[in-house]
Amino acid sequence: MIKYILGIVIFIAIVLVAITIGANNDQIITFNYIVAESQFQLSSLVAILFGLGLILGWLITAFFYIKLKLKNMALARQVKRQTLQINELTTTRDKVV
């Protein structure tokens, strides 16, 4: 519960900082990208680039998280299979003795 409250507080702090920065940066700048050129307000450009960075970070994190989850599931299956084999071997050994 504390983790969620802390996350909400951090999110609100980031939003407040973004609003403050956006309110103070209203100048128009020219943004050149590979295909074209556009004019943006500095605050809008910062918000767009921040959002793209956030989305890219989440996608990269999700990729590695899913990769680790799949590896964890495979290892759990392997442990279960080996546990069954050990139990089977000890059962057959006990029957022989």
Curated annotation (Swiss-Prot):
Subcellular location: Cell inner membrane
Membrane-spanning parts: 1-21, 46-66
GO annotation, biological process: lipopolysaccharide metabolic process
Superkingdom of the organism of origin: Bacteria
Membrane topology: Multi-pass membrane protein
Keywords: Cell inner membrane, Cell membrane, Coiled coil, Membrane, Transmembrane, Transmembrane helix
Coiled-coil boundaries: 67-95
One GO term describing the cellular component: plasma membrane
UniProt similarity note: Belongs to the LapA family.
Function: Involved in the assembly of lipopolysaccharide (LPS).
Name used for this protein in its record: Probable lipopolysaccharide assembly protein A
Species per Swiss-Prot/TrEMBL record: Haemophilus influenzae (strain ATCC 51907 / DSM 11121 / KW20 / Rd)
